[in-house]
Amino acid sequence: VQIFVRDNNVDQALKALK
């Protein structure tokens, strides 16, 4: 579950960087 949450955070960070 933690990995899933982390993946979600990474997805948002990537979108913010883009």
UniProtKB/Swiss-Prot annotation:
**Key words of the record:** Ribonucleoprotein, Ribosomal protein
An annotated GO cellular component of this protein is: ribonucleoprotein complex
Q: Does the keyword Ribonucleoprotein apply?
A: yes
Provide the family line: Belongs to the bacterial ribosomal protein bS21 family.
Protein name in UniProt: Small ribosomal subunit protein bS21
- Protein's organism: Brevundimonas vesicularis (Pseudomonas vesicularis)
